[in-house]
Amino acid sequence: MPKMKTKSGLKKRIKITATGKVKRGNAYRSHLAQNKTTKQKRQSRKSSQLSHSDFKRYKELI
């Protein structure tokens, strides 16, 4: 049976680190920023890691 294709939408949104962890960007940044606090906007600039339970689901898509 052939390999499954990688989901290209996911491929553009995540990076896999050298240790095998998955980095992702944060949501809620594209618009309506005036309703969010400065702290929310500042913290959402940082990238975060995908949780272990989510990684199990995403592994099939990668």
From Swiss-Prot:
Protein origin, superkingdom: Bacteria
Pfam families xrefs: Ribosomal_L35p
Keywords: Ribonucleoprotein, Ribosomal protein
InterPro entries to which the protein is assigned, alphabetical: Ribosomal_bL35, Ribosomal_bL35-like, Ribosomal_bL35_CS, Ribosomal_bL35_sf
Disordered as annotated region, ranges: 1-62
Basic and acidic residues bias locations: 53-62
UniProt-listed GO biological process terms: translation
GO molecular function, one term: structural constituent of ribosome
Any one cellular-component term (Gene Ontology): cytosolic large ribosomal subunit
UniProt biased composition (Basic residues): 1-26
Family that this chain belongs to: Belongs to the bacterial ribosomal protein bL35 family.
Designated name of the protein: Large ribosomal subunit protein bL35
Organism field: Metamycoplasma arthritidis (strain 158L3-1) (Mycoplasma arthritidis)
Lineage: Bacteria, Bacillati, Mycoplasmatota, Mycoplasmoidales, Metamycoplasmataceae
Gene name in the database record: rpmI
